[in-house]
């Protein structure tokens, strides 16, 4: 068999292969340098960045579940200026695009972040986390109302020339409605799914396990939900999808691509296996060779081929 093409295009961002990392599970990337060759990744998605430094939520803020984990980190980060000053320079030395995940308390916050990062050398694209509370609207998450999600997307789009990837929340009634809203507002690509809202209770203390009470559920438990939503969104809009949500191995990653994902992000698996991204990349290569696939793009949306219309 001839050479295999692994290159994909995620909304204007060229990736050497479809494997990247889920924000918040890979630090700023450099933490994993002792375990893997970061230059082999298709992209590095760094942890959520805000305008000002954030200490995050009180502890405990992580808990293991039977098929995944709960987290309520609270977007702990040093702030965008410190990120650009301290963390971005070493990332520039790696031959891998850097995607910065951004979060805000208001539409204006998102616009300012986009403007600041647009001028930062070494930032390849922005991933917009809309699963944040809108302080001006009583704390309702931007990602649960189409109009709010569109407003955030528009603010980012108007302040950057870089590819804009909007990360959708699964905690909605109709994921396709949200997808259409942000695509119409200027999103170049979509990332889904973010974590599902969950909780756990310690029966000995009779109290919630997390200090924040509720947290984001990730890991294998949410894979069927993520696959279903990616499948639906692929049929609803015509922009690339960055798929995530319970990807633990190459079989999972391939299933996400068959459902419609152009690229995939590895999250919770990084905590249990620091080499998960490399194992998944190698597994995708082996699958393609075994199945006679010459171009990984052939996999994207292939699970829809039996349908018409």
From Swiss-Prot:
Note accompanying the cofactor annotation: Binds 1 FMN per subunit.
Binding-site positions, FMN: 23, 47-48, 101, 129, 167, 193, 219, 245-246, 267-268
SUPFAM superfamilies: FMN-linked oxidoreductases
Highest taxon of source: Bacteria
UniProt entry keywords in alphabetical sequence: Cytoplasm, Flavoprotein, FMN, NAD, Oxidoreductase, Pyrimidine biosynthesis
EC class name: oxidoreductase
Active site: 132 (nucleophile)
Catalytic activity entry: (S)-dihydroorotate + NAD(+) = orotate + NADH + H(+)
HAMAP family according to UniProt: DHO_dh_type1
Classification via NCBIfam families: PRK07259.1, pyrD_sub1_fam
Protein's name in the database: Dihydroorotate dehydrogenase B (NAD(+)), catalytic subunit
Organism name: Heliobacterium modesticaldum (strain ATCC 51547 / Ice1)
Species classification: Bacteria, Bacillati, Bacillota, Clostridia, Eubacteriales
Gene: pyrD
